[in-house]
Amino acid sequence: MSAGAGAAVEAGFSSEELLSLRFPLHRACRDGDLVALCSLLPHTPRAHLAAEDSFYGWTPVHWAAHFGKLECLMQLVRAGASLNVSTTRYAQTPAHIAAFGGHPQCLVWLIQAGANINKPDCEGETPIHKAARSGSLECITALVGSGAHTDLRNASGLTAADIAQTQGFQECTQFLLSLQNHQMSRFCHNGTLSGGHESILPTHVSLGTNRKRCLEDSESLGVKKARTRVPSLDHAMPLANGEAEDDADRMHVDRECAAVSDMKNSSSVLNTLTNGSVVNGHLDFPCANQLNGMESRSHPCLTGSNGVSNGQPLSSGQASVSANGTEEPEKTMGINPEMCGSLHLNGSPSSCVASRPSWVGDIGESLHYGHYHGFGDTAESIPELSSVLEHTSCVRVEQRYDSAVLGAMQLHHGS
């Protein structure tokens, strides 16, 4: 029969009759006619299992997947049909067709049989894009549970969530967006964004009572964040990283600040005699500006190599006062005014770190010494040293207070 005669014969048939005559496998899969399919398969060459019809360009497997005929789909695959066969026109696999048709049972079976669920079609869309177009939350759930990528974009730059939102499927949109946000959050917290391995423990849990903070507490510009006070309940357990010790430190600082305030109100001379305070269990002599409210830390304070201050550095134009009330000659310390509170100035890692950059604001009110350079409260990490220094500092503050009062009385009475 010539091509013209064949065309004339086909022109006289309806599409239904033409489908039954020329594509009996396709018709059986469309109708779910398992008896007819099983009778045709033994006599059908394997190459005909991949034949495309003249209507949609689908193979029998695509027809079974689109209409949700799971039994026909299983028989075709057992007879040798391919799971990942792509159509010539749109490069769509049976998984694309099942997802777009909204048939999760066929889609799940294809996935379990080994179908590729991340293969794009001619538009760059994977099966999850097709499920989003049809609004099938069951198919989306099946695909996601099997490892489908929700962040893939089609040729138009749209993700599955974008397509679902465009089609008006709000439930699918919210589900896909929540998955994307959860995956991105877990991706960042586990450190895999920078090529690291996933963290086994949560980021806020530490295995010890070390007061040092990890590098994750650093800001993007390299400045270490101040240790903030975590609000706790009465029955809350102390944190594993030792932050519960901060309360005792702050109480000690408040007590010493109150003592300095009382001495400052006694006499103007006491403002010069009283030149020390205790910060975090260490004896720290503040600068001149600190005596006026104990607030400013813009001038450097010298600290000894053991973490205990040896005395108050004298700034330009300031003279020291001896115990008998006489002024000593003015001394000038050659200290870089830009240095920001190194814990140890000699032989420690802090001394090798550059001074505080000019673009960093006044962080003295929120950071104790040693915080900027990233080495934490080193001396506080040793419990024995911290206890000894705390006791010693209390005794020395009390002695200074008595000496200051005595000196003020002697100056007042002129003795």
Swiss-Prot record:
List the residue ranges of the region (Disordered).
303-330
SUPFAM superfamilies, A to Z: Ankyrin repeat
- Name of protein: Ankyrin repeat domain-containing protein 10
Pfam families named among the record's database cross-references: Ank, Ank_2
What gene is it encoded by? Ankrd10
The answer on whether this UniProt entry bears the keyword Transport reads no
| Keywords of this entry | ANK repeat, Repeat
Q: InterPro entries from the xrefs?
A: Ank_Repeat/CDKN_Inhibitor, Ankyrin_rpt, Ankyrin_rpt-contain_sf
Q: Name one GO cellular component term.
A: nucleoplasm
In the record for this protein, the ANK repeats are positioned at: 20-49, 56-85, 90-119, 123-152
Biased composition regions of type Polar residues, renumbered to the chain: 303-325
Check the record and name the PROSITE patterns matching this protein. Answer: ANK_REP_REGION, ANK_REPEAT
